[in-house]
Amino acid sequence: MISCLFYGKISLSITKNVRCAQNGEKMRTYLVTGGAGFIGSNYIHYMFKKYDNEIRIINVDALTYAGNLENLKDVEKRENYTFVKANICDKDAISKIFTENDIDRVVHFAAESHVDRSIRNPEIFVQTNVLGTAVMLNCAKAAWELPGGSFKEGKKFLHVSTDEVYGSLPDDDNAFFYETTPYDPHSPYSASKASSDMLVKAYMDTYHFPANITNCSNNYGPFQFPEKLIPLIINNALHGKKLPVYGDGKNVRDWLYVEDHAKAIDMVQEQGRLFETYNVGGHNEKQNIEIIHIIIETLQEMLPDSDPRKAHINNDLITYVEDRKGHDRRYAIAPDKIKAEIGWYPETMFKEGIHKTIAWYFEHEDWMNNVTSGDYQKYYNEMYEEK
């Protein structure tokens, strides 16, 4: 049965020393932070699909607005899955997880991640993204370090970051972000992620701490909270609401289907050279306005003529709003290194990925309705309706 822990509130038993049914050997144990969020939950689904009962996953998540246990409903009864409700800034809670479990791998997703929210409330981004990462690093170091300063064999910490730390690229199709590109963050969010990246780099350099960093482009796919562009446009179009576009709509982003990202993270864990950074990009660069047109066209293709929503989904819904402060013009990742060293490449082209994403939201309208109620609606009104 599932173990579910609420540190600081209710403490239930946690299964320890789980054995692999196939050969009796100890399962490799993954500690996944932020696993109830968009990318984290997709990663957990991917890992269980690939490894089934060969691994054990402990998912720690504070369940803030974007964390949702509904994302993991189909894995919650697995004996090799444990959920822990805790904040990564809580040193005692995180230390307890390491003390009570032989953690082999840490996959650190947990972060505040929405640029607009960081502009409105930067302090929480510094606290979670910088302090929280420091707590995770310290607890992992304390658990894994051997006398003399070396580390236990087979341990690895993977810090999941963003291409936004690199700043903005010019409107030049030949300009890309590489692992050697200097950091130049322009928002409180990207500055907080750049700071957390630097902490991980410092631990690798100072302590020879076993870690990797991945910097990914914009993700899309199932379970994404609708403050982000693609689910926002899908949801608004289906409800006949305006489709807000910042500025002139010509900002460019590189889009990566979330399952491709999950695969990349697994491959870096298994094959990546320690202490290295790997850029993970989708080679799907598109202007924001182009994304909106593609979503409108795809909805028109997928909805039957009998669906009354089809009639009002058109370009008339597009509404240009005041541009975001410090809005970076273009992001584009060159994933050459991860392809050459590990053999990873993005498998999902955008047309296929957006079709799968829209199909998922069609099949999970209750999920969308649940997450767009309450506080989200208040936030949405402040961000878009009042502009």
PLM region spans:
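N-terminal Rossmann-like NAD(P)+-binding domain of SDR-like oxidoreductases, especially those catalyzing
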Residues: 19, 23-219, 269, 298, ...
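Tryptophan-centric aromatic hotspots in well-structured domains and transmembrane helices
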Residues: 65, 114, 125, 177, ...
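Short, positively charged and aromatic/hydrophobic N-terminal segments
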Residues: 9-22
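A glycine/serine/threonine-rich, flexible loop-to-helix segment
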Residues: 75, 173, 226-234
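Short hydrophobic targeting helices and cationic amphipathic motifs
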Residues: 5-7
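Residue-level recognition of oxygen-bearing side chains
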Residues: 93, 124, 131, 225-229, ...
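C-terminal substrate-binding subdomain of Rossmann-fold SDR/epimerase-dehydratase oxidoreductases
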Residues: 12, 42-46, 50, 57, ...
